[in-house]
C-alpha cells in the first residue's frame, strides 16, 4: 500500500503480540513515514529495541488493556489517531532537500566540537550532513542509510563503540559495525 501511495500513515493498537506484529511491519516503512503504535507494552519498564528497531515509530501507552472502549481507552485511542493524522498532514507539506551529496558523521559528547566544525565546513561546501549519535542505534542507522543509498559518505569520527565491544563497555557495537559501508 505504501509503495502504491495508497496510505499516508499507519496506526496500530495492540497488546504484546499485536505490538510485535505491527511494529515489525512498521520497521519496513521508510524513515519519515508516519508510524504510531498504541500498546499495552509501551511503558517505562519495557525494552523497545524489538518494537522500534532503528525506525521512527511513535509508541503511546494504552494505559488500560485493549479490551473494548471505555472512559480510559477512548481518549488514548483518539490521541493515537490524532498523532498519525497530524504526522501525515505535516509530511504532506515537508520539503526534503534533494540533489546534494549526503555525508553522515558519528558524534557523542566528547567529539561534539570536532564534529560540529567538520559539519560546518561540509555544509559550506554544499554537502548535506546527517549527524548520528553513536549510542549503538546511531551506528546501525548510518549503516542502514548507506545500504538504502541515502548517504554517499561516512565520517566515523566517534569510535567509542569499538572500545565498548572490545572491553565490554556500556556502548558496544558488534563486529559488523559499518560492515556495509566498509565492504
Give the location of each predicted region.
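Hard-cation-handling environments
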Residues: 127, 146, 152-156, 182
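Cap/lid and interdomain-hinge subdomains that line or gate substrate/regulatory clefts
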Residues: 45-110
